[in-house]
Amino acid sequence: MASHAVTSGQKPHVVCIPFPAQGHINPMLKVAKLLYARGFHVTFVNTNYNHNRLIRSRGPNSLDGLPSFRFESIPDGLPEENKDVMQDVPTLCESTMKNCLAPFKELLRRINTTKDVPPVSCIVSDGVMSFTLDAAEELGVPDVLFWTPSACGFLAYLHFYRFIEKGLSPIKDESSLDTKINWIPSMKNLGLKDIPSFIRATNTEDIMLNFFVHEADRAKRASAIILNTFDSLEHDVVRSIQSIIPQVYTIGPLHLFVNRDIDEESDIGQIGTNMWREEMECLDWLDTKSPNSVVYVNFGSITVMSAKQLVEFAWGLAATKKDFLWVIRPDLVAGDVPMLPPDFLIETANRRMLASWCPQEKVLSHPAVGGFLTHSGWNSTLESLSGGVPMVCWPFFAEQQTNCKYCCDEWEVGMEIGGDVRREEVEELVRELMDGDKGKKMRQKAEEWQRLAEEATKPIYGSSELNFQMVVDKVLLGE
């Protein structure tokens, strides 16, 4: 790999390619911005579908980029559509795995024959876009895989093949979910229900089960793997991963680096990749509220629920008599438009704000926010920990179950709500979160993690700062 070392006077050129979902695109954009700030020429690659969605949500010039920060797109292999919804995840995973390598190689060839653009010297791709490894090896450049889940989620994925070997997956029936899992190094007191949800496959042909076995196995070929977490949060789990794949680095929380290193008003700071318009009025509303008084509710970019579950959450929140900011995506209710009961809207009129999307990192670091009702996606969990905000967790799929387990038992910052959603339980847990003794203890614990997250990203000495610099120097620049 020595051949890729960047010659003096030549700008290093990184191609960043996220998996085409909001929760993967956002952290990859942060990595791209940090590399740009360190002198890299950046090409950021979306799928055509998401490229078009971003232009619709952010305006026709939103992906014009900068002279050294360019946007490109490749097809995802699925029929062309112009919708503003998240694509079906299994279909998308299967398609990217089978169809994206050829257009990606063609894009690299085109970039490398473009005048006045430095040749591609390295690739940073999503952990589940491992087809890029074939292109990188052909080109003789390093490929760093960015696995966007928690370290505990990633370690579980690395062991998916063992679940199949042990006959634990595909599962026989729901009762299997209580099976104790005590053989993953450094992961204690787990049940099968706490393992990423794709393990719940009911047949050997299941797309997601096979996809993660395939992607986790290929991870070992990466020049390095980066994780958006920090050592003190997941120390033992990270060491267990490193015993399987030594070249693993924790470089998070990424949003703390970006907030520190990138001026929000600068050209690079202005570049965004949210597929829904962020309603900044949320922050003005929070400014009118007293500290720790508001419940923030957001189930992320993929979670869907039934109309009945939406109504139960609504009346549970109403019964707490707390102020709340609730993000309700247009596609939150499966196959329908989310409809809140008129009585609920009247009753809560003076103590709520509803939005279809919001600037979440700013919300979770706002002093008015005292608790977070979340789906336990990793970006949300990390932003909540970094803001010192405790959580009520309603995990939906993927490694959200694992994150929820760790939030509740290991990090002591969360309480889990039942999957069926009853308004009485919503009320009880949210009241405990905001006013109860357990809620106070969880807030203290969250504030401890906040301090440790800030330490990890400290200039010069922070563990994540040192790791990020090492990945840049040793791997991406090949020094």
Curated annotation (Swiss-Prot):
Protein's name in the database: UDP-glycosyltransferase 85A5
Keywords, ordered alphabetically: Glycosyltransferase, Transferase
Top-rank taxon: Eukaryota
Name of the top EC class for this enzyme: transferase
Tissues where this protein is expressed: Expressed in roots, shoots and leaves.
Gene3D superfamilies per the UniProt record, alphabetical: Glycogen Phosphorylase B (3.40.50.2000)
Disulfide bond positions: none
InterPro entries: UDP_glucos_trans, UDP_glycos_trans_CS
Residues bound to UDP-alpha-D-glucose: 301, 358-360, 375-383, 397-400
Homology family: Belongs to the UDP-glycosyltransferase family.
EC number of the protein: 2.4.1.-
Molecular function as annotated in GO: glucuronosyltransferase activity; UDP-glucosyltransferase activity
Organism: Arabidopsis thaliana (Mouse-ear cress)
Keyword Cytoplasm: no
